[in-house]
Amino acid sequence: MRHMTSAAVAAALAFGVSSGAVAQYAWQPEQPITIIVPWAAGGSTDQVTRVVAGEIEDALGQSVVIVNQPGASGSVGTKNAWDAPHDGYTWAAGAASDLGTYPVLGMLDQQLGDWALFLDVANVAVIGVNPDSPYQDVTQLLDAMKANPGQVSVATAGLSSAGHNAMEAIAQQAGVEYKHVTYDGGNPAVIATVAGETEVTTQLAAEQAEMIRAGRLRPLAVIGNEPLELAGHGTIPPVTEQLPDISLATNYFGIWTPQDVPPEVLETMGQVWQEKIANSKALKDYAADRGALFTPYSGEDAQERAIGMVRQNAWLLYDAGKAAVSPDEVGIERPES
């Protein structure tokens, strides 16, 4: 009779445990999963998606490959994810608000409900300036924009990006005009302000955090209703101190795949979200370090949470004359004032 060595027994037990852990899922991927990040490396979407990818790998026992495909405000990579086979092996990442407003901008035909959403964090934007900037607070910045319409340069990741939508909300509420300078991602937009190419950036706290902590950017306000406590820096006041009537919805980020992938894919990923992502220390630590909110939602819950920012941004773009299609035409209701 053949006997197993103690090492072999240990290996077999380890295999049984790991394979059993994976076997609990209806979908067991047989090849690497690709997540397309439709922005440049180093931005907020890229950062958080890499954290989430590691957790998915651990849960499913399969590699997750991140591919950066920036272009056209994230719509290029998102379209590539949609055009790939709907088999669960190709996903896109980003802000749900971008995903929902692409039809209004004439960039993509697919609407928010055509995608299965798996959210991970909610990010807030920050008004950041170069340390040498003459603007010491939001009031001074807005006064400059009023005095010099269309002259103060603001760097964002592109049309309909989180930074752009945040600045549009401010501009409409304050009645100012600015010079919009776009980049292929939040990180390049932040670097542009650090380097003095632009005067202001309104990209996300997650993208500005390191530069703020290093003293290479000076935050004027968080574009939100509450102060932001940024680890290693301190308190950033809310823009509502100067603009109390500004309307702000929550900006959710995550990954998504077409709704018509095999049902076992969505069932399995829903389980992964409830069991793994919702308890992820790595993701919680990321959120705390980057000034983000931990929001591990999926299914109908994710759709209901995401639609608020989609409505806000779609109508902001339309009212600013930057939409190709009326939100009404693609079923996006105007938010209640």
Q: What is the predicted role of each segment?
A:
Residues 1-8:
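Bacterial N-terminal signal peptides that target proteins for export
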Residues 18-23:
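Sec/Tat signal peptide C-region and signal peptidase I cleavage site
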Residues 24-111, 151, 175-199, 204, ...:
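N-terminal (or domain-start) structured segment
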Residues 151, 155-236:
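Ligand-binding pocket segment of bilobal, Venus flytrap-like solute-binding proteins
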Residues 208-280, 327-337:
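C-terminal lobe and pocket-closing loops
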Residues 30, 56, 80-90, 102-188, ...:
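Hinge/capping helix and adjacent helix->loop/strand transition within the periplasmic-binding protein
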